Curated annotation (Swiss-Prot):
It is found in: Cytoplasm. One of its GO terms (cellular component) is cytosol. It is an enzyme of class 2 (transferase). The gene is rsmA. Specifically dimethylates two adjacent adenosines (A1518 and A1519) in the loop of a conserved hairpin near the 3'-end of 16S rRNA in the 30S particle. May play a critical role in biogenesis of 30S subunits. The lineage of its organism: Bacteria, Pseudomonadati, Pseudomonadota, Gammaproteobacteria, Lysobacterales. S-adenosyl-L-methionine binds at residues 17, 19, 44, 65, 90, 112. Belongs to the class I-like SAM-binding methyltransferase superfamily. rRNA adenine N(6)-methyltransferase family. RsmA subfamily. InterPro entries: KsgA/Erm, rRNA_Ade_diMease-like_C, rRNA_Ade_Mease_Trfase_CS, rRNA_Ade_methylase_Trfase_N, rRNA_adenine_dimethylase, SAM-dependent_MTases_sf. PANTHER family: DIMETHYLADENOSINE TRANSFERASE, DIMETHYLADENOSINE TRANSFERASE-RELATED. This is Ribosomal RNA small subunit methyltransferase A. It holds the Pfam family RrnaAD. Its EC number is 2.1.1.182.
Length: 265
């Protein structure tokens, strides 16, 4: 069953695929479980398929939308339901901390992310995890599989390690192409990310950690001795208890953290 609010053609330049299937809309709302007074921020509200049910539950909501043509009809549809604040900007330029007012609840992020820039958006919000309670995103299933992949998996990579270091990542359910208008060529999936307690992460230098993960998976067929030759010495590996002939996909997230924290003495 389709649920379309207004006739706004999808724009390929924005990577738009509007969710229109009521069954999957309801499943997503149930997964989010919105509560009154939740501080929800939606990335890419589109035609409001998720926006309006959330607004009805919470009374207010902030949406970040780049497509100017969607703002007026979305505002009109939202007016009877509650207070909708729309930020007309690229989400990659938005500092979410300006939305997290002192004393307020942490932000809850939701969104059907444009597939062409989903990874940059994930890394952008990851940098602001301290002010986020949880995130529910719809992405290309292939990306969701990479996000939740365990060590040893063929799709375990930089995205897996970086997200799992800071968040608990859960794959919720798959959404087929025919739930969208226009339908994408691939399956989508809903993922839930819950930022970890910062006191349990214990990464001494986040830049060094990021550099090590990037370099290790940038040459994933090489042993870590070779792929990290410019970053880690034998002493780093010894102190972290990691074999130099191991490859990136064999390391647990905690082992990458140990290697980043290891001393060169």
């Amino acid at each position: 069953m389709e649920s379309q609010l207004f006739n706004a053609p999808a724009k390929k330049a924005f990577g738009q695929h509007f969710l229109v299937d009521r069954y999957y809309i309801d499943r997503i709302i149930h997964a989010i479980t919105p509560q009154p007074n939740d501080h929800i921020v939606e990335i890419g509200p589109g035609q409001g398929a998720i926006t309006l049910p959330l607004l009805k539950c919470c009374g207010s909501l902030t949406a970040i939308e780049l497509d100017r043509d969607l703002i007026a009809p979305l505002t009109a549809a939202a007016t009877p339901l509650g207070k909708l604040d729309i930020i007309h900007r690229d989400v990659l330029t938005v500092d979410l901390s300006i939305l997290a007012k002192p004393g307020n609840k942490k932000l809850r992020l939701v969104g059907n992310l444009p597939y062409n820039i989903s990874s940059p958006i994930l890394f952008h919000v990851l940098q602001q995890a301290a002010i986020i309670a949880d995130m529910h995103f719809m992405l290309q299933k292939e990306v969701v599989d990479r996000m939740a992949a365990p060590p040893g998996s063929k799709v375990y990579g930089r995205l897996s390690v970086m997200l799992q270091a800071w968040c608990e990542v859960t794959t919720m359910f798959v959404v087929p192409p025919d739930a969208f208008q226009p339908p994408p060529k691939v399956n989508s999936a809903i993922t839930r990310l819950v930022p970890r307690d910062p006191t349990t992460i214990r990464i001494a230098d986040t830049k060094r950690f990021s550099d090590i993960v990037r370099a290790a998976f940038g040459q994933r067929r090489k042993t870590l001795r070779n792929s990290l030759a410019d970053i880690c010495t034998p002493a780093h590996f010894e102190h972290a208890g990691i074999r130099t002939n191991a490859r990136a996909e064999q390391l647990e997230v905690t082992e990458f953290i140990a290697l980043a924290n290891a001393k060169d003495t």
